């Protein structure tokens, strides 16, 4: 008897939920099957459920409700992605970049493919605490591709925090209390992926280098991966004799797989293109 009552309670709960999501409408009608149908999508809003001792009619969601639920889920997902992008502190100019929008060339094809595979296999990368070191000359696309990875992950609801060592130091100087600084560090540690842009551009004071090391070491201890971009070469990082820098670079090289970026600066290419376009326009050749 108790088992039967429990079964009835579950059925009643299902029926109540369906009724709440899909209440009757004056325009709804009884179809040839004897069930209530939606006046808009023409689908049943009821279902006959055959039990061992009887048949009961229970409310169900029609296609209109299912479609609305799907739209609500899409809206919630979009809001979550937008929130992740706001929290990521990514520069606005990078928030729409994607692997599909990057101009591919002989020089960057391999780098794009590796970064894309890293993003697509991030669950495994996260499990291994495996990061990336994107290194090479100025303007070769390191920051752009790191942001492509970030956007791919955030579109899949993975939290990312991206900043530079220079900005970290600037932010810390602006905090009014030690608690603010601790909360800032915790945000970096909590993110599923942390992107540190332009390592090596920070001032070489003991304080600055200690902060950078603490941030990187915090990621190491939290077991969460990071991506580091730098204009330094592997030789410069491996051969560094300054102990303050050396321990930073050693930790990065321990955690991050290196990908070299070579070729002509993308920024210089873009500047040259803009120059040519303006020349044609101003000379009346456009």
Where are the regions a protein language model picked out?
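Pre-Walker A (pre-P-loop) alpha-helix and adjacent loop at the N terminus of AAA/AAA+ ATPase modules
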Residues: 93, 101-132
């Amino acid at each position: 008897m108790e088992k039967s009552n429990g079964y009835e309670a579950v059925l009643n709960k299902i029926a109540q939920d369906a009724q709440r999501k899909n209440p009757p409408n004056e325009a709804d009608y009884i179809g040839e099957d004897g069930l209530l149908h939606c006046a808009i999508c023409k689908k049943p809003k009821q279902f006959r459920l055959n039990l061992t001792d009887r048949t009961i009619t229970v409310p169900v969601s029609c296609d209109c409700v299912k479609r609305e639920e799907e739209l609500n889920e899409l809206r919630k997902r979009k809001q979550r992605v937008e929130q992740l992008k706001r929290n990521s502190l990514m520069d606005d100019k990078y928030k729409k970049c994607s692997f599909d929008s990057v101009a591919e060339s002989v020089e960057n094809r391999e780098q794009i493919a590796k970064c894309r595979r890293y993003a697509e296999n991030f669950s495994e990368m996260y499990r291994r605490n495996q990061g990336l070191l994107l290194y090479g000359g100025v303007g070769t696309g390191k920051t752009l591709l790191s942001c492509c990875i970030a956007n791919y992950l955030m579109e899949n609801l993975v939290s990312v925090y991206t900043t530079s060592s220079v900005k970290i130091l600037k932010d810390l100087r602006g905090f009014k209390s030690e608690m603010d600084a601790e909360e800032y560090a915790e945000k970096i540690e909590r993110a599923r992926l942390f992107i540190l842009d332009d390592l090596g551009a920070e001032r070489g004071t003991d304080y600055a280098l200690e902060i950078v090391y603490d941030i990187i070491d915090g990621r190491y201890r939290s077991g969460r991966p990071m991506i580091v971009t730098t204009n330094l070469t592997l030789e410069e990082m491996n051969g560094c004799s300054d102990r303050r820098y050396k321990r930073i670079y050693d930790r990065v090289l321990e955690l991050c797989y290196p990908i070299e970026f070579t070729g002509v600066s993308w920024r210089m290419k873009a500047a040259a293109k803009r120059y040519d376009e303006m020349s044609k326009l101003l000379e009346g050749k456009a």
